[in-house]
A protein has these predicted regions:
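Coiled-coil termination/hinge junctions
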Residues: 1-12, 16, 20
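Conserved, carboxylate-rich catalytic/transport cores that coordinate ions
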Residues: 18-184
Length: 184
């Protein structure tokens, strides 16, 4: 008579192999399990902690998910994007607005008993990094540093702060003999 053979190929996670083997045994299937090779176009599933996973909406949007045999830089990418975002926006008031928007979106979802999308939490982190950079540079709403409260001026970092833009700053390695303004 006629004999027909059907087969399919695919990829699955290693932790599912036992289930697949059991199903094959129960159904009398032939089963061949191989590790992928460099030539295979293997889908990538990233596994990171909850904090690092917050970067996934951005990496998915940018299409920067690493290949199966590539190193996952999600943690490094999150760290550097937070630093660069804070530097680029660089104003504490913008950071407060971003953080407030993220908080409003999170609260709205919690009240509706919906899951909080990672993008909302990432927006909050972007806001916090912008607040931090605005604080260390004493940049708040474009106001001159001397118009800001003294406590904001005092917690800024002299070499990058607007408080010291027109003042001479003496780096510790010059023993007070050479000074710079932050404009130099």
């Amino acid at each position: 008579g006629n004999l027909s053979v059907a087969y399919f190929t695919g990829y699955d996670e290693e932790e599912n192999l036992l289930k697949i083997k059991e199903a094959a045994k129960e159904n009398s299937w032939g089963l061949l399990i191989e590790d992928p090779t460099e030539e295979d176009n293997v889908p990538t599933k990233l596994k990171n902690n909850k904090f690092v996973s917050l970067i996934y909406p951005l990496t998915d949007f940018l299409g920067t998910v690493p290949g199966y045999f590539e190193y996952d830089i999600s943690g490094w990418f999150l760290g550097f994007i937070l630093i660069f975002f804070g530097i680029i926006f660089g104003d504490g008031v913008y950071g407060l607005l971003l953080t407030a928007a993220a908080a409003a979106l999170i609260i709205k979802n919690k009240k509706a008993k919906k899951e909080i999308p990672p993008a909302f939490l990432l927006l909050g982190l972007f806001g916090l990094s912008t607040i931090l950079w605005g604080t260390v540079t004493c940049t708040w709403g474009g106001l001159p540093a001397e118009k800001l409260p003294q406590f904001l001026q005092s917690i800024s970092i002299p070499v990058i702060s607007n408080v010291y833009a027109d003042k001479i700053w003496y780096p510790f390695w010059t023993n007070g003999e050479a000074g710079l303004t932050t404009a130099q």
